[in-house]
């Protein structure tokens, strides 16, 4: 009898709490709009994470979700000529292949359209801006994000987002913390909008050295600490080897460390080849992954698939994959299945030709977008850390 009374009392209390929660949710939606608060399972935007491939299968696996997530901020940093811009251009090419729209904010004024074209970027559809100062670059970024029509935005680079006050000042003037305050304010404004618009925003950053560091790494990134906190993924990319063909350098082997990852376990690594002629060598990465997962056997310099030798040395196996895209497709899907990544559609697999190392000498067309500047670099009460 006592147990029945206790159960009824508990059930009544549960109903009252449920009614109170429903009333609170109704009040919040009435005040702030529908969708301002909801149960996590009912929000498909949060439960289903859309991703865009990085262009490197090994890096897609290291990220744990198959690529760069939508609606998030990504930071890619590393030394000079380590492959930062190449990696972002590969992501742009993958976005365009899926029918998405990409934008490149070239604050460094160094984008080479002929090189981008060799990486698979459709330069005719790529939106490019070359702003005059940091405030203008971030205003352009905000306008593109608020349009809800852009899938990927790349900002190259944070170090080149120079505040207007510094540009208008004299050489040698001290502008302590100006860029850090600019980045802090911009990221506070952009983060929520980026999430709602499902736009992936990639910041390329440079490395500086801290003075007087006795223990630990003296390296740090530019633009203060705000980007480190707001970024969902931070990638450290380094060149570890120069690839040569008949004593002539033809590319670099790079190592990417996932320093921070809010979407999957961090601290994983990926290694892949970046060729000067056509960017990330997809076939070379596939060979390494196939050997790692015992899909292709390696004995000395010989590689075998299903008991049959397919080539001596990685270059011969790479040519074998290019000549037999069906086999490459099958192996790649096996690798993807073993790493819980979505499988490829066979219709998308195409044979690619090995291009010679050439650079067009056409001048880059400057596309300057003028937008009203509203980002302030004045102190706003936040602690801003400079370079």
From Swiss-Prot:
Record has Nucleotide-binding as a keyword: yes
InterPro entries with a match to the protein in the record: AAA+_ATPase, DNA_recomb/repair_RecA, DNA_recomb/repair_RecA_CS, P-loop_NTPase, RecA-like_C, RecA-like_N, RecA_ATP-bd, RecA_C_sf
Biased composition (Basic and acidic residues): 355-369
One GO MF term: ATP-dependent DNA damage sensor activity
Main localisation: cytoplasm
Name of this protein: Protein RecA
Entry GO terms, CC: cytosol
Protein's UniProt keywords contain DNA damage: yes
Family label: Belongs to the RecA family.
Gene Ontology terms describing biological process: DNA recombination; DNA repair; SOS response
Domain of life (superkingdom): Bacteria
Function: Can catalyze the hydrolysis of ATP in the presence of single-stranded DNA, the ATP-dependent uptake of single-stranded DNA by duplex DNA, and the ATP-dependent hybridization of homologous single-stranded DNAs. It interacts with LexA causing its activation and leading to its autocatalytic cleavage.
Region (Disordered): 355-387
Keyword annotations from UniProtKB, A to Z: ATP-binding, Cytoplasm, DNA damage, DNA recombination, DNA repair, DNA-binding, Nucleotide-binding, SOS response
Subcellular location: Cytoplasm
Taxon lineage: Bacteria, Pseudomonadati, Spirochaetota, Spirochaetia, Leptospirales
Listed HAMAP family: RecA (MF_00268)
Chain residues that bind ATP: 78-85
């Amino acid at each position: 009898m006592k147990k029945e009374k206790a159960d009824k009392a508990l059930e009544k209390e549960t109903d009252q709490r449920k009614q109170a929660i429903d009333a609170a949710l109704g009040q919040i939606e009435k005040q702030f709009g529908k969708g301002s608060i909801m149960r996590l399972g009912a929000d498909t935007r949060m439960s289903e994470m859309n991703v865009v491939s990085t262009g490197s299968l090994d890096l897609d696996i290291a990220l744990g979700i198959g690529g760069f997530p939508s609606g998030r901020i990504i930071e890619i940093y590393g030394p000079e000529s380590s492959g930062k811009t190449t990696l972002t251009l590969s992501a742009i090419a993958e976005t365009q292949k899926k029918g998405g729209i990409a934008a490149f904010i070239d604050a460094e004024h160094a984008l080479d359209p002929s090189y981008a074209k060799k990486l698979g970027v459709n330069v005719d559809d790529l939106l490019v801006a070359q702003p005059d100062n940091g405030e203008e670059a971030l205003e352009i970024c905000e306008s593109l994000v608020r349009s809800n029509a852009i899938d990927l935005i790349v900002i190259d680079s944070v170090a080149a987002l120079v505040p207007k006050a510094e540009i208008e000042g004299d050489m040698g003037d001290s502008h302590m913390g100006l860029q850090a305050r600019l980045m802090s304010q911009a990221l506070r404004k952009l983060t929520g909008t980026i999430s709602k618009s499902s736009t992936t925003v990639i910041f390329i950053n440079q490395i500086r050295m801290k003075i007087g560091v006795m223990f630990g790494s003296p390296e740090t990134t530019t633009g203060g600490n705000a980007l480190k906190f707001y970024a969902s993924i931070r990638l450290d990319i380094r060149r570890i080897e120069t690839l040569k063909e008949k004593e002539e350098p033809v590319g670099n082997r790079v190592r990417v460390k996932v320093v921070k990852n809010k979407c999957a376990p961090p601290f994983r690594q990926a290694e892949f080849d970046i060729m000067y002629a056509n960017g990330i060598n997809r076939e070379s990465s596939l060979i390494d992954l196939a050997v790692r997962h015992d899909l292709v056997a390696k004995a000395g310099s010989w590689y075998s698939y299903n008991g049959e030798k397919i080539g001596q040395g990685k270059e011969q196996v790479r040519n074998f994959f290019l000549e037999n895209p069906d086999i490459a497709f099958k192996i790649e899907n096996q690798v993807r299945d073993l790493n819980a990544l979505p499988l490829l559609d066979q219709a998308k697999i195409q044979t690619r030709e090995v291009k010679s190392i050439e650079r067009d000498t056409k001048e880059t067309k400057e596309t300057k977008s003028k937008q009203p500047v509203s980002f302030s670099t004045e102190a706003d009460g936040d602690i801003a850390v400079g370079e």
